[in-house]
């Protein structure tokens, strides 16, 4: 056993996991269960009563958090300590939404003034674009933004921009390109006019393969329209740490926005990477997004463990992953605007906690990051919810829904809510054989047929879920929701004693991909790799199977 699993706290939880009653019984014997196991914070409401926990189990989970020194680790992150030890970096995405009078130091320097100076620069940039002051090379105002990035510099801005569609100013269209597959870029370029398009390139190094390839092709397309190299400065801006490469490309240094190495890509939407969000919803709404996240930061750092929303959600995930062998976790958004969140949370959690080495390099002997997946309610109810209800795997679920719709049309929203709440009840309650048999009592089936069909209609229930509600989807509540999942992810990493802020698996893929690229473009047949890779490379060169 590792030092994580060989603790009294861990062993106590293991013991509790083997003797819990069904949730039906837990609700039947405690009429106050919902009141005891629900929580409001930062414009969000969490009902975690439909989980396989008792007050005793929760107490043991909080003891596990104390044993892992969770509160000290939280404080260390917010203080700017080097908690990303493998890359020797602070982890300070939280500083990007800190108030302007905060003091957060990296290497003895307060980074908050630079953060707010960048916000002011973003505000001026947004104003010049949306007011029509910024003009393209033919004198026309900008109408379209093409944001080129990959990973966190793509997914975060795209999902947030999509979620905040009710707050779009209507002055611009925004298109996102990430995949190096040319089709992604080509199809977007069909929608825009080079005279009125601004390209925003986001890459810390200005050398990320996919992003640079797409940006170079976008520039070629732009120049083929009749523009000159000097005109590039009027149609390209960048978010990067490499100012020299950006200016060599043709971008005006005034339109280069900074990135810092103490912000990981999957946490970067709060930085200038979020520029597309600000362009689409305006600075007031963008600042409200930051304020919502800041409110969750304040809750996370100040609330006691037993009243701390990210802590509770993170510990519940550990509970199921390590004591019930849950290998995946589903996120179900009952709001069309939030349909992209499962993919965003997938990247956040799986890139952060998909690790097999502990902080000291010891190999873990327990499960770490689960597979995060999900989709939009009610669509999923006619597809994969079948697996949730009657499959053999335990899959904890998060249901997310605003109480008020931005589009209150007829009975749509009340039906949506009834489905959301009905699903959580069905997962918890299930259906017994006796209940299924009673439902068939009035049918014309024989007794044997009734018995057979009843067995097929049995649902074990006892399937755990959280329900997250908000009054209405706003920039502030969205900011709080995303920060909630950020901190939930961190809590899990602390319990497991892993580094949630590096991504060496991603780096290996890049390295090997570059090696294969060199072989794909070489003249001779591939022979230096394994037989499968060699054969695939040679097939690609031939262009046919």
Swiss-Prot record:
InterPro entries registered for this protein in UniProt: G6P_Isomerase, G6P_Isomerase_C, Phosphoglucose_isomerase_CS, SIS_dom_sf, SIS_PGI_1, SIS_PGI_2
Catalysed reaction equations from the record: alpha-D-glucose 6-phosphate = beta-D-fructose 6-phosphate
Molecular function GO labels: carbohydrate derivative binding; glucose-6-phosphate isomerase activity; monosaccharide binding
Cellular component terms (Gene Ontology): cytosol
Domain of life: Bacteria
Key words of the record: Cytoplasm, Gluconeogenesis, Glycolysis, Isomerase
Subcellular location: Cytoplasm
Listed pathway(s): Carbohydrate biosynthesis; gluconeogenesis; Carbohydrate degradation; glycolysis; D-glyceraldehyde 3-phosphate and glycerone phosphate from D-glucose: step 2/4
Pfam families in the cross-refs: PGI
Record: active site: 351 (proton donor), 382, 510
HAMAP family linked: G6P_isomerase (MF_00473)
Family listed: Belongs to the GPI family.
Name this protein carries in UniProt: Glucose-6-phosphate isomerase
Source species: Shewanella amazonensis (strain ATCC BAA-1098 / SB2B)
Record gene name: pgi
């Amino acid at each position: 056993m590792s030092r994580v699993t060989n603790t009294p706290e861990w062993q106590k939880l293991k013991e509790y996991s083997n003797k819990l009653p069904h949730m039906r019984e837990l609700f039947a014997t405690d009429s106050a269960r919902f009141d005891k196991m629900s929580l409001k914070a930062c414009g969000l409401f969490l009902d975690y009563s439909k989980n396989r926990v008792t007050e005793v189990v929760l107490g043991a989970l909080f003891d596990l958090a104390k044993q892992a020194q969770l509160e000290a680790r939280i404080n260390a992150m917010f203080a700017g300590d080097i908690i990303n030890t493998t890359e020797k970096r602070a982890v300070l995405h939280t500083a990007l939404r800190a108030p302007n009078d905060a003091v957060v130091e990296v290497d003895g320097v307060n980074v908050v003034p630079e953060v707010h100076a960048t916000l002011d620069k973003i505000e001026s940039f947004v104003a010049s674009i949306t007011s029509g002051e910024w003009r393209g090379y033919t004198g026309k105002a900008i109408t379209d933004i093409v944001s080129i990035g990959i990973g966190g510099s793509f997914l975060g801005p795209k999902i947030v921009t999509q979620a905040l569609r009710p707050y779009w100013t209507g002055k611009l269209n925004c298109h996102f390109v990430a995949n190096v597959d040319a089709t992604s870029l080509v199809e977007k370029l069909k929608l825009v006019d080079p005279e009125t398009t601004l390209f925003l390139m986001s890459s810390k190094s200005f050398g990320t393969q996919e992003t640079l390839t797409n940006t170079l092709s976008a520039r070629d397309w732009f120049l083929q329209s009749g523009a000159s190299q000097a005109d590039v400065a009027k149609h390209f801006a960048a978010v990067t740490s490499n100012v020299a490469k950006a200016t060599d490309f043709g971008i005006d240094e005034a339109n280069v926005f900074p990135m810092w190495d103490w912000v990981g890509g999957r946490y970067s939407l709060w930085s200038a990477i979020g520029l597309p969000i600000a362009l689409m919803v305006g600075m007031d709404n963008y600042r409200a997004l930051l304020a919502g996240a800041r409110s969750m930061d304040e809750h996370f750092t100040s609330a006691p463990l037993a009243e701390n929303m990210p802590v509770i959600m993170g510990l519940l995930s550990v509970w199921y992953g390590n004591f019930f062998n849950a290998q995946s976790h589903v996120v179900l958004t009952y709001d069309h605007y939030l349909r992209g969140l499962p993919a965003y949370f997938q990247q956040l959690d799986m890139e952060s906690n998909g690790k097999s080495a502990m902080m000291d390099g010891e190999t873990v002997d327990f499960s770490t990051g689960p597979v995060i997946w999900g989709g939009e309610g009610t669509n999923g109810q006619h597809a994969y919810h079948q697996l949730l209800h009657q499959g053999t795997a335990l899959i904890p679920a998060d249901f997310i829904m605003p109480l008020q719709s931005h589009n209150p049309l007829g009975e749509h929203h009340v039906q949506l809510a009834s489905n959301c709440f009905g699903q959580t009840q069905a997962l918890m309650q299930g259906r017994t054989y006796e209940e299924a048999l009673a439902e068939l009592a009035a049918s014309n089936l024989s007794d044997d047929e009734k018995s057979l069909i009843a067995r097929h209609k049995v649902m074990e229930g006892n399937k755990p879920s959280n329900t997250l509600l908000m009054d209405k989807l706003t920039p502030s509540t969205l900011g709080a929701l995303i920060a909630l999942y950020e901190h939930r992810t961190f809590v899990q990493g602390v319990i497991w004693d892993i580094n949630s802020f590096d991504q060496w698996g991603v780096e290996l893929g890049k390295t090997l991909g570059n090696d294969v690229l060199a072989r794909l473009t070489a003249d001779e047949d591939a022979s230096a790799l394994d037989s499968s890779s060699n054969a695939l490379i040679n097939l690609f060169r031939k262009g046919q199977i």
